Structures are given as C-alpha cells and as structure tokens.
C-alpha cells in the first residue's frame, strides 16, 4: 500500500499547489509511482501547473458520483509515465463531496500508487476536512511571514486533534530569501520551527524561475541547476527516508516580537 500525504497551509498564496506539483514530479522522476490529487473543487489549478489542462476529461467528483472509473479520470503526465493527476471539478463546489467519500477514494488510490499527494484548498472549512480524510501524514507549507505562520499554527492545531489518524506532520518553509534572513529582515528558520513545534521537511528559496515554470506548465523540480528545483528534489528524497542535509540559512532578531503574537 502507498502513502497518502496531504499538503496544506491554512493561508492561500504560500505556494502549496506549486509544492504539490514539484514534489510529485520529483518523486516520479526518482522512480516512484505517484498520483497528485487536486481537492480544490471549483478552483482547480494543479492541472495548469503540470501542463495537463487540455487533457482533462473526467474529474474527482465524476469518480465519486460514479460517472466514471478512477482510472478513466487519471491524467498521465506527458513526460513522466509514473506521474498521474486526478483533477478537481471546475464547475462544482466543495459540497459536492464529503469526507467519507474522499477517504474511500484515496484508499483506492493507495492500492495503485506508491505516493498519493493531496493538494488541500486554503482555509479550515469543509475542503480542508475532506482533504485530510484518509491521509497518513501532512506537509504544512508556510512562508516566513507572520500571517502565514499564524495560519499554519491554526492548521497544525487541527492536525494534532486528529493524531490518532495522522502519523505525523512536517513543515516546508517556502520563499526564503537568505539575504533578508541574514540581515534580520525576515523570520528565521529556527524561530518558525520553534513557534510551530514541527519537524522541518525542507526549505525552498525564493526563485523567480518558479513563476516561469508555472506559466510553462513544467515543474521546476525537473530542471537541473535551479536552487528551488533542487530543494524540491531534496524534499522528495527526505519523504522517502533519505538523510539529505538542509540548506544552511542563518538569521536572528524576530523571535521576541513573534512570541507576543503566538502566546
């Protein structure tokens, strides 16, 4: 059986869907059979980031409603034969499915793939509850901004309330700017991890090539010699249990201010 990993954030706009696409592509490139699932019903974007928007015929809601079989809805990646996408419905809303239905679906996918990555919609309402149903573990994506860290803290509280169902959660800190960290103008990695009491899965530096790759529908993790791409490849290796060193980014100065916000 495979592993189901929900990728969540709480706050929108932190790069959660980009993270899902890049980790999925990296895992597939490293030889794993991977399915990425877009749970943002009504606002799907994962197909665009993967360059598969013109190949979508059926979607997740069609599978749950019995309109098609799950294999009919899966869209194979054009370059990576072991990577598949299960797209969200674009013309429905989050009430079209419930947590029990999603749990049954991801259980079926676990039997078909080594890894199932569920791209969770922003927020803590029904879309979040549906997305974590059946997940084995969670990845919380956060940026070094106070609002993002506070929202992630809320999400982690909800994940910890389901610790009997989830094995673990780990953090991916996205859009780090080393120069600002070292100049004490951006929250530092240790401070974020201490506030969120989470294990660090990876650090992704801010990289303008992410925008370019998104517009081209080509995950950056497939591109050699790009710092963010290498970061995603390292995250994929850590997910598989490899001991890969983290980037060395230092910086001090924010924690006293932050403790007042989170206390």
Mark where each language-model region is.
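Short, amphipathic alpha-helical "lid/cap" segments that border enzyme active or binding sites
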Residues: 21, 229-236
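Flexible glycine-/small-residue-rich
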Residues: 9, 38, 87-90, 120, ...
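P-loop NTP-binding site
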Residues: 199, 218, 234-263
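P-loop/Walker-type NTP enzyme "switch/lid" segment
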Residues: 39-111, 214-215, 221
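Conserved beta-strand scaffold positions in the cores of enzyme catalytic domains, especially
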Residues: 4, 85, 200-203
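Conserved catalytic-core segment of NTP-binding enzymes
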Residues: 101-104, 108-111, 115, 121-206, ...
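Walker A/P-loop NTP-binding active-site region of P-loop NTPases
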Residues: 4-67, 115
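C-terminal boundary of histidine-terminating zinc-finger modules
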Residues: 216-230
